Amino acid sequence: MPRCTLRFEKALHRDGAERIAGIDEAGRGPLAGPVVAAAVILPPRFSLPGLTDSKLLSAQVREEFYLELTTDEKIEFGVGIASVDEIDRLNILRASYLAMERAVSSLRAAPGHLLIDGLPVPVFSFPQTAIVRGDMRSLSIAAASVIAKVTRDRMMLSWHEEFPVYQFCDNKGYGTPEHLASLRTHGPCPLHRRSFAPVAQTYFPFA
């Protein structure tokens, strides 16, 4: 497993870059709920042992890291959300880009360079570096992945109270067998992405 460090951030600093922001998103794959992105600028000597891709962490550890990341005054972060309606209207890729744009726009000031997990994001005019498996290699991206994931999970937990038959508290909108069974029985709710095939193939009691 790659080590998650500040080596990318430090290399950019040596080249003169300032305000280096890691960006990641959560929620591209689920059948329900928004897509959420986060942008994070870490201080130069930042350390948080164990921080890595949010998908590799337990829910409890994610929450602990989220609290540390969002209460440290030396850490700057922004969150952006694209709604279910925007996902259905734009498609999930463009909605993900929109969430990332909103996350960057909510930083206190514009970043000087972006570190992005996976592939380049064409909507940004800022200099950017795309890093394969970046959420396991760059601490800035890993921090963004945790903030985005916990933010989205908390939203899905709150919506479980309104739509308990879909068990969003457990599946967070992903297409588990139980979730698919609930879709077949009850049809989609307003949180479901109607442009996604498993949802589009069911009836719409809320239409």
Write out the residue ranges for each language-model feature.
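RNase H-like, Mg2+-dependent phosphodiesterase core
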Residues: M1-A207
